[in-house]
Amino acid sequence: MTTSSPTATTAQAHGRFIRGSVSKVRRVLDQIRGRTYRDALIMLEFMPYRSTGPITKVLRSAVANAEHNLGLDPSTLVISQASADMGPSMKRYRPRAQGRAYAIKKQTCHISIAVASQTDS
């Protein structure tokens, strides 16, 4: 985990090896990027996607890091960076007709979220 931050008032959190495809996670992250913490939580609560659970967990971790490590108020935080990168695929096999086997790739991804104080962004 890299802890390099662009400014002193930016806190980060990473979720690694999250089950789900990168494209499905990115469509949710694109919706919350640039929004305030409170607005993002409300949006994530009512989105009909399965990937909102792990994203909410990583977002709350980033805000907790901002509170604990930097002493920032959660009401002033904005999501400055949100990205998803590809993780390793778990390879499984499904039996098919006439003794064949089809390969199934269960994809994982890495989620990174950074929050910054609203006065700095």
UniProtKB/Swiss-Prot annotation:
Keywords: Ribonucleoprotein, Ribosomal protein, RNA-binding, rRNA-binding. The keyword Ribosomal protein applies. Pfam families: Ribosomal_L22. One of its GO terms (biological process) is translation. One of its GO terms (molecular function) is structural constituent of ribosome. CDD domains: Ribosomal_L22. GO terms for cellular component: cytosolic large ribosomal subunit. This protein binds specifically to 23S rRNA; its binding is stimulated by other ribosomal proteins, e.g. L4, L17, and L20. It is important during the early stages of 50S assembly. It makes multiple contacts with different domains of the 23S rRNA in the assembled 50S subunit and ribosome. Part of the 50S ribosomal subunit. Belongs to the universal ribosomal protein uL22 family. PANTHER family: CHLOROPLAST 50S RIBOSOMAL PROTEIN L22-RELATED, LARGE RIBOSOMAL SUBUNIT PROTEIN UL22M. This is Large ribosomal subunit protein uL22. It comes from Synechococcus sp. (strain WH7803). The gene is rplV.
